[in-house]
Each structure stands twice: as structure tokens, then as C-alpha cells.
Amino acid sequence: MAQNRVSRLMQEDRKFLIAYYMPEFPLPGSTLPVLEALQKSGVDIIELGMPYSDPIGDGPVIQDAAHTAIGNGVHIAGILDLVRKARAGEGCEKITVPLLLMGYCSPLIAYGGDCFLSDASEAGVDGLLIPDLPPEEAEDFLFRARGFGLSVIFFISPETPPERIGMIDGLSTDFSYCFAVNATTGTAKLAGADSERDIESYLRRVREHTKKKFVVGFGIKDRARVEKMWNLADGAVVGTALLQAIRNASTPEEVALMTAEFWKTLKS
């Protein structure tokens, strides 16, 4: 397939800082200002959550953000429209960084598989992360997604055996996404020597059995954790901490300001 933005980015020999954001959280009208603030603050990739009423792997902060987004009228078609506007520079500066969508199978099936892939590609989406899509059952989806120029990123956990790590690495288009711990999103306790040793051992094992890049998410909230993950992986994903930083904003403009202020703490 022709290279999209994320494929081109992953050819660069450096570490990456990735944001996860739930559209229209905490307020309607927040998404485009947040995307602009993140891009101006030097984000490498933005993951946009597709809210679902029954998320199986999300911690309480992201669950609450999803429920808020749904209450604010967010749905897949609306997210794709926001991506179109972002790419065109309607309501914000033109967004040129890679945009990924992260969500669960059920809403995508309800939307219509090929219709979703076509609409996502046309809107300017670069790739997809679907936590409940088993790699072993994804061959047809992968083929179709790549036909629309979309990357597909699969997940690795601390319990993934070495041979399966290699299989996931082979299937993921550009990089794999590692859960930093066996816990729901953002709820992990990363303190303590034992936990640190476990994480380091796990990520060294991933490095040993992968050829492509991999990034780490779940529980990363400050510059120290970003640098720790950069020493072990190719990128760090910050989501829960970002949502916590902006959840008390009272206007979309304040959401954007809080986003920029928080992201600055991760960059320096």
C-alpha cells in the first residue's frame, strides 16, 4: 500500500511521543482546539478514541471520558467529520500529524466494515487500533484496511508468549502497541523495584522478538515515565493523564490551553 503519514514517520530514527484523546471531552467543541494545541506542542501522533458504552480494557478515567463524549453527541460519523475538518484546517490550523482511531469492534461492525474503512481513509485517518480484534482472526480485515491505505496496529501484553510477539510484530503495519502492565488503562501502579524489573524484562523480551518499532502505553503520566519508556521502547503514549489534566476546563479555549500546558511538561 502507499505510505501514509504514520508509515513515513516510523522510518525516522528517533523516539516518539503519542497522545490519546477522547473527542469532545470534556466539552462539545473541544476536539479541534485540542488537536491544534497538541500539534503546536510537538506531538508526534494523535490517537482519537471512539467511545463505546461497554469498553473492556479501559480504566475509569477513559471510561468516564467515553461516557461524557457519548453524552456530548459523539459517534463514529461525527469523529470522521472532525478529522475531515482538521485535515482541511476548518476551525483550526491544518492538522498534518498522523491521526489514528482507537476503538472496539462492535461499533465498527454496526457502521459497516468496508464503509467505515473507506470513510476513515477519505477523512484523513492514517491507522486503526482495535483492542478486541484478535490478530489470528484479522487477516481479511488487514487486507481490506491496507487496501484503503490504513495502518493496523496490534497489541502486546506482558503475558504474550515470545512466538506470539513475533506474529503480532509481523502483522502490525508499522509498529506494535505494548500494554505497560497487566491492568486497565491508566490504573497501573508503576512504583516499586519489582514492578520496574518486571516492566524492563517484559520490554526487553518484546525487543528481542520484534523487528518493527513498538510503543508503550498505560500509566505514563510525566516526563520521567516518558524517558523511562523511551529507554526501553520506541515511543510513549500518554492518554489518561492528558484527560485528567483537562477534565475541569470550562470552555473549549481553556481545554486547549490546559492541553498545551500539560504537553509542555512532557517535553521538558
UniProtKB/Swiss-Prot annotation:
Active site residues of this protein: 47, 58
Entry's family note: Belongs to the TrpA family.
Pathway: Amino-acid biosynthesis; L-tryptophan biosynthesis; L-tryptophan from chorismate: step 5/5
Protein name as it appears in the record: Tryptophan synthase alpha chain
Subunit relationships: Tetramer of two alpha and two beta chains.
Lineage of the organism: Bacteria, Pseudomonadati, Chlorobiota, Chlorobiia, Chlorobiales
HAMAP family referenced in this protein's UniProt entry, alphabetically: Trp_synth_alpha
Organism: Chlorobium phaeobacteroides (strain BS1)
Catalytic activity annotation: (1S,2R)-1-C-(indol-3-yl)glycerol 3-phosphate + L-serine = D-glyceraldehyde 3-phosphate + L-tryptophan + H2O
PANTHER family assigned to the protein according to its UniProt record, in alphabetical order: TRYPTOPHAN SYNTHASE ALPHA CHAIN, CHLOROPLASTIC (PTHR43406:SF1), TRYPTOPHAN SYNTHASE, ALPHA CHAIN (PTHR43406)
